[in-house]
Design a protein with these regions (language model features):
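Covalent nucleotidyltransferase
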Residues: 1-199
């Protein structure tokens, strides 16, 4: 297990982030997005007043899946997707592994992504170019996340089970889904088929 601190833009640029099938749907609402945007706005204000100010968004737990050359997000999915939606709005041309490989077949996830994207557009509609550029700069300098990387899938799932008390609590069926899917890590077809049936 290794841990390092990086800015959000570097997290998107340097890691082949993927949201694995065992993850629950994307559940963040407009209220969660509004709180996050306000936190970022406050961090931007603080960074203007205090030299070298950094705002730590939280921790992200990822499994380094070297066999498939990707980094599976084990914990922190809701924050990562939300931050990505904000950054993608600020720079519509931005391209990274996550933007090319994110696939949300779950209707709840799709609906929340659409709703939150619309809210982000509305929220920024009253901001000028300077304010938008300050947000971009914050993603590159001010906003940080602790990235915890594990190589062993079993260790990743053990940490996943212990970490889910943070953020939005997991439903019992989400925990059961994660528990059963982790036993299928050697058979990708079986896992994908099980996810389709589960959803």
């Amino acid at each position: 297990m290794a841990a390092l601190t990086t800015n959000i833009k570097a997290l998107f640029d340097r890691y082949n982030l993927e949201i694995p099938n065992y993850q629950r749907p994307y559940k963040w609402t407009r209220k969660n997005i509004e709180d996050l945007l306000n936190d970022i706005e406050n961090a931007i204000s603080d960074s203007a007043r205090y030299k070298d100010f950094r705002y730590r968004i939280g921790a992200v737990l990822i499994h380094d899946d070297r066999e498939h050359d990707r980094m599976n997000v084990v914990d922190g999915q809701q924050r990562i997707i939300s931050l990505f939606l904000i950054y993608k709005h600020l720079d519509s041309q931005y391209d990274c592994y996550l933007s090319r490989h994110a696939c949300f077949s779950n209707r709840e996830s799709q609906g929340n992504i659409q709703d939150n994207s619309a809210f982000i557009r509305q929220w920024f509609s009253s901001r000028d170019d300077h304010e938008r550029n300050m947000f971009i700069s914050a993603f590159e300098k001010t906003l940080e996340v602790v990235v915890i990387t594990v190589d062993d899938p079993a260790e990743a799932f053990q940490l996943f089970d212990s970490q889910n008390s943070r953020g939005k609590p997991l439903n019992p069926h989400d925990l059961l889904k994660a528990y059963h899917l982790r036993e299928m890590t050697d058979d990708l077809y079986e896992m994908e088929h099980a996810v389709e049936k589960w959803e």
